[in-house]
Amino acid sequence: RLLSRLRSKSNKLFIAYINQMTQYDSEAINFVLRNVRDNDVKFIRLWFSDIVGNLKGVAITAEELESAMTRGMGVDGSSIDGFARSKENDMFIVPDPTTFAILPWRPKTNAVARMFCEILTPDNQSFEGDSRALLRRNLAKASDLGFTYYVAPELEYFYLKDSKTAEPLDTGGYFDQDPQDIATDL
């Protein structure tokens, strides 16, 4: 219902907004659809985060994916903390095809994939609480001020005594040396 109302109001505006916002092209969408077909993907989890960073999402079938990528999926924003009051509950999500990945811990037969989504308001605007849009806005502001944003992963791990318990191998912490840090020579 929501998407029908939005599209009937301004289909051209909706399409223009999606194209401008995400710059997705048919090649990216076709790549995802081909991978879904070739890898026996049956369900796609459409992920987004709430205003405090908790992962949220809905699952759709492979048959619903093309429509979701080109038209969006309606969601009830009032059911998600911090998104909308009950009188302003209509929102929708649009999967980003560049984030498509098959979940490796799921079975290969009837596979499951995931995609992160853009969150839009009923007037086709980026939702202020969408963490992806917020990051883009802040990176643009930082760039306008002459800053460059750099990011890199920091890998951390723990050695455990065995695979049955979560008991650490030693009591060493940051910068500790022998005898507390038994794992030094591993």
Each predicted region: which residue ranges?
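N-terminal amphipathic/basic-hydrophobic helices that include classical n-h-c signal peptides
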Residues: R1-Q20
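Glycine-rich, acidic/polar active-site loops that bind/position phosphate-bearing ligands
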Residues: M21-L186
